């Protein structure tokens, strides 16, 4: 009997039984022992709930406009490369938390502490690879980033690549960039063209190279279901980023921040601040740097936060 014939016959028998008043009762089979199939693990109900998405410190998955950052900049080797290295990681955590608290009264949004750590350091000598850039091994940075993460400190890894492409160096630190609260900074001052040397020429980068990094970070965010990733671009003169108007700032996975690195008198800093905003794509946020030694004087929190537009990221060097 075909499948259709059996279905029709079954329906007819059921109709006859119902019409005759016969009660049809479904009997459950007696309970027996659980059947275990080797190699197959049946998940508990709770295991079927998808894991919660990772969030940024302070909550949420988009960086701005719901928060600002205050950061210590430098390298763990010591104070010569910035304020971060003036103390150990625990001391830096205490210090940057205090700095962030000083800025909070001047911001309606939460001000979160951060580190900007130089991961690759511009070098006066070419090194064995001829690239004028010293790569800090990931294993040296791992305990620092772990400690910062445990303390709720956002970390930005800064690249000073010499003759190396930014993307090549960024990939070295992918294990950290795959974390939800680690961002990236590109420092074009130290991106050399063939034949150039640090402190002889000021480096530069084209938007096409920056966009390779944007695409890489966006893909990383998608693959690991991460919150939005911060990409900081350092600049203090227009020639440092060529075709800047073509920087891809429209990817929702990446928030691009232009870090104005001008130093000197208040008038000089404000001139740099204004000049760098000319022709800036509207999706790019502005960041500010305070120098302890080169600024005369160093801006106070109140002075810094009266700058327009109000910076989303303030670093100390």
Regions of interest found by a model, annotated:
Residues 53-62, 93-109, 169-179:
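Short amphipathic alpha-helices and their capping/turn segments at secondary-structure boundaries
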Residues 29-90:
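N-terminal module-boundary/linker segments of secreted carbohydrate-active enzymes
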Residues 2-28:
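Secretory targeting and sorting signals
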């Amino acid at each position: 009997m075909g499948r259709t014939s059996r279905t029709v016959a079954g329906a007819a028998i059921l109709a006859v039984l119902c019409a005759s008043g016969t009660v049809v009762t479904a009997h459950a089979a007696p309970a027996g022992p659980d059947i275990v199939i080797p190699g197959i693990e049946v998940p508990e109900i709770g295991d079927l709930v998808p894991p919660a998405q990772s969030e940024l410190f302070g909550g949420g998955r988009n960086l701005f406009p719901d928060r600002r950052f205050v950061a210590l900049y430098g390298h763990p080797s010591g104070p010569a490369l910035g304020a971060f290295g003036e103390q150990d990681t625990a001391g830096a955590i205490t210090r940057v938390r205090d700095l962030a608290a000083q800025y909070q009264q001047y911001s309606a949004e939460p001000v979160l502490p951060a580190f900007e750590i130089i991961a690759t350091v511009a070098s006066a000598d070419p090194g064995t690879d001829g690239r004028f850039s010293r790569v800090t091994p990931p294993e040296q940075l791992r305990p620092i980033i772990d400690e910062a993460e445990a303390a709720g400190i956002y970390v930005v890894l800064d690249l000073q690549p010499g003759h190396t492409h930014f993307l090549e160096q960024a990939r070295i630190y992918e294990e950290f960039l795959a974390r939800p609260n680690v961002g990236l900074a590109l420092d074009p001052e130290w991106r050399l063209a063939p034949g150039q040397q640090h402190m002889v020429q000021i480096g530069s980068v084209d938007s096409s190279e920056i966009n390779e990094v944007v695409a890489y970070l966006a893909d990383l965010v998608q693959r690991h279901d991460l919150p939005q990733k911060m990409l900081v671009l350092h600049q203090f003169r227009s020639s440092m980023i060529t075709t800047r108007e073509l920087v891809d700032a429209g990817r929702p996975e990446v928030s691009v921040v232009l870090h104005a690195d001008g130093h000197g008198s208040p008038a000089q800093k404000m001139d740099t601040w204004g000049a760098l905003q000319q022709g800036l794509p509207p999706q790019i946020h502005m960041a500010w740097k305070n120098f302890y030694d080169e600024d005369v004087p160093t801006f106070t929190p109140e002075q810094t936060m009266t700058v327009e537009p109000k910076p989303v990221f303030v670093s100390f060097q």
